[in-house]
Amino acid sequence: MKAVVTRVRSASVVVDDSVVGSIPDSDVGGLLVLIGVATGDTSATARAMAEKLARLRIFEGSTADGRPTEVSALDVDAPMLVVSQFTLMGDTSHGRRPSWSAAAKPAEAEPIFNACVEELRDRGLSVDTGVFGAYMAVESVNDGPFTVLVDIPSGDRS
């Protein structure tokens, strides 16, 4: 399972001219997370990804004595907008056309994607999503910009 995680000031996803998920503009902002599910990913992979995303220390904070520190979405109650994106699994190492062979088929990927979203919610995070498999327009106002890649190998339980 792969994720592109972007710290944003605001973000939204639109399907058929309707906003289906968003992160409102705020001082804290949130995380726009694009997730690709790989063949072989399991609920354990989804759980490991959710734990990593929830505790990834990429927000600015400060200690009680005012020293700067990095804090997680959990620490600052930052909302997430999580969007499925099978193209993250594209392999461009050969030729000019991406291969999608590493991407899980939709029937396999959707329950794993949903499990990751539920794991995030179970940790107390506010999570909006796009519509799995739909054509979506995603808009964001990046903060920083600050974007990281998270890769949890299939079956990883760490």
UniProtKB/Swiss-Prot annotation:
State its Enzyme Commission number(s). Answer: 3.1.1.96
UniProt keyword list: Cytoplasm, Hydrolase, RNA-binding, tRNA-binding
According to the lineage, what is the superkingdom? Bacteria
rRNA processing recorded as keyword: no
- Record field: catalytic activity: glycyl-tRNA(Ala) + H2O = tRNA(Ala) + glycine + H(+); a D-aminoacyl-tRNA + H2O = a tRNA + a D-alpha-amino acid + H(+)
Location of motif Gly-cisPro motif, important for rejection of L-amino acids in this chain is 144-145
UniProt-listed InterPro entries = Daa-tRNA_deacyls_DTD, DTD-like_sf
Question: Any idea which GO molecular function terms this record carries?
Answer: D-tyrosyl-tRNA(Tyr) deacylase activity; Gly-tRNA(Ala) deacylase activity; Ser(Gly)-tRNA(Ala) hydrolase activity; tRNA binding
Free-text note regarding domains: A Gly-cisPro motif from one monomer fits into the active site of the other monomer to allow specific chiral rejection of L-amino acids.
Q: What does this protein do?
A: An aminoacyl-tRNA editing enzyme that deacylates mischarged D-aminoacyl-tRNAs. Also deacylates mischarged glycyl-tRNA(Ala), protecting cells against glycine mischarging by AlaRS. Acts via tRNA-based rather than protein-based catalysis; rejects L-amino acids rather than detecting D-amino acids in the active site. By recycling D-aminoacyl-tRNA to D-amino acids and free tRNA molecules, this enzyme counteracts the toxicity associated with the formation of D-aminoacyl-tRNA entities in vivo and helps enforce protein L-homochirality.
What name does the UniProt record give this protein? D-aminoacyl-tRNA deacylase
Originating species: Corynebacterium kroppenstedtii (strain DSM 44385 / JCM 11950 / CIP 105744 / CCUG 35717)
Query: Coding gene?
Result: dtd
